[in-house]
């Protein structure tokens, strides 16, 4: 009798945590585990629920606690070998600097460790963190080896120092990002509201593989009549799985991975919307959906053969 053995991929996910709901680590952990990853979870904060609710309570971990857990515990004492580190919200400038320094050294010391960095700064024109964190993230992106960065539109604008309103703006922003941050191998901007697509009631998700192409690619995604929390965290987690998971012998291109991830995430958002409408009844205006229905979307998450959301368009840079 013969058997095929494979090693389960292991990821350290450093993000926020909520007791109720699905953002940060709660949006990443179950989907990654359900798709076969061994996930070590480091919670940078512990809140009752996310800040999109009217009220929340909880606490932030201190810089010393976070550093001790990663440096002395996981790496120093246990000597755990990770395939990937997925980092998101960190509560202050010092925590961001210290944790990024440890993760950066870990990735510099081993080609096998890939850093997926979600530079959590804010959204919709509003900062979630101290303004000093912008400069810290710029320094991190300049000096460390990043496998994939996943900013949203607002974060991309902060990182490159320009507004993005049109497709040409997006092209210039990607060019500037690559010039400023040459150690970042791949970038996906998880949501772009561009003037060319507003009449179509669509938004754009765009990417660039700095090592493999001179073209930006983008997918045009139909809008769902709702505001979601946690969708960006889910995209980052599912890109980690699609690009680095053990389901295939050869790594997919960033463009192909993003097409599959967008199909999966959009399917989850649509099912979440449909379940909310079933509970609330038909709605004429945009509804605020606080939490993704991840448990109810197990049938979507378990698929091995994920279709693409469509064919991407490309722009030469």
Swiss-Prot record:
GO terms for cellular component: cytoplasm; cytosol; nucleus. ATP binds at residues 190-191, 220-232. It catalyses: pyridoxal + ATP = pyridoxal 5'-phosphate + ADP + H(+). Its cofactor is a divalent metal cation. Its EC number is 2.7.1.35. GO terms for biological process: pyridoxal 5'-phosphate salvage; pyridoxal phosphate biosynthetic process. InterPro entries: PM/HMP-P_kinase-1, PyrdxlKinase, Ribokinase-like. Keywords: ATP-binding, Cell cycle, Cytoplasm, Kinase, Metal-binding, Nucleotide-binding, Nucleus, Transferase, Zinc. It comes from the Eukaryota. It is found in: Cytoplasm; Nucleus. It is an enzyme of class 2 (transferase). Coiled coil: none annotated. CDD domains: pyridoxal_pyridoxamine_kinase. Required for synthesis of pyridoxal-5-phosphate from vitamin B6. Important for bud site selection. Belongs to the pyridoxine kinase family. Present with 6580 molecules/cell in log phase SD medium. This is Putative pyridoxal kinase BUD17. It comes from Saccharomyces cerevisiae (strain ATCC 204508 / S288c) (Baker's yeast). The gene is BUD17.
């Amino acid at each position: 009798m013969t058997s095929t053995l494979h090693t389960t991929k292991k990821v350290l996910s450093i993000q926020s945590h909520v007791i109720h709901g699905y953002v940060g680590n709660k949006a990443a952990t179950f989907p990654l585990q359900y798709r076969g990853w061994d996930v070590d979870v480091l919670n940078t904060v512990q809140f009752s629920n996310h800040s999109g609710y009217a009220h929340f309570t909880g606490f932030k971990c201190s810089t010393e606690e976070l550093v001790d857990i990663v440096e002395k515990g996981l790496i120093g004492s246990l000597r755990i070998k990770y395939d990937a580190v997925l980092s998101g919200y960190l509560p202050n400038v010092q925590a961001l600097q210290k944790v990024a320094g440890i993760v950066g050294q870990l990735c510099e010391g081993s080609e096998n460790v890939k850093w997926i960095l979600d530079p959590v700064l804010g959204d919709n024109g509003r900062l979630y963190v101290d303004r000093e964190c912008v400069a810290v993230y710029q320094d991190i992106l300049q000096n460390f080896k990043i496998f994939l960065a996943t900013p949203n539109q607002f974060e991309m604008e902060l990182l490159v120092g320009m507004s993005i309103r049109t497709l040409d703006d997006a092209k210039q922003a990607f060019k500037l990002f690559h010039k400023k941050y040459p150690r970042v191998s791949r970038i996906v901007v998880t949501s772009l509201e561009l003037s060319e697509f507003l009449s179509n009631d669509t938004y754009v998700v765009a990417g660039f593989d700095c090592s493999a192409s001179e073209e930006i690619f983008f997918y045009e995604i139909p809008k769902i009549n709702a505001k979601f929390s946690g969708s960006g965290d889910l995209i980052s987690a599912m890109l980690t799985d699609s690009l680095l998971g053990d389901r295939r012998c050869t790594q997919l291109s960033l463009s192909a991975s993003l097409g599959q991830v967008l199909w999966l995430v959009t399917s989850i958002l649509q099912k979440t919307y449909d379940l909310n409408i079933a509970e609330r009844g038909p709605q004429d205006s945009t509804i605020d959906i606080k939490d993704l229905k991840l448990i109810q979307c197990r049938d979507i998450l378990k698929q091995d053969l994920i279709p693409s959301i469509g064919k991407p368009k490309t722009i030469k840079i």
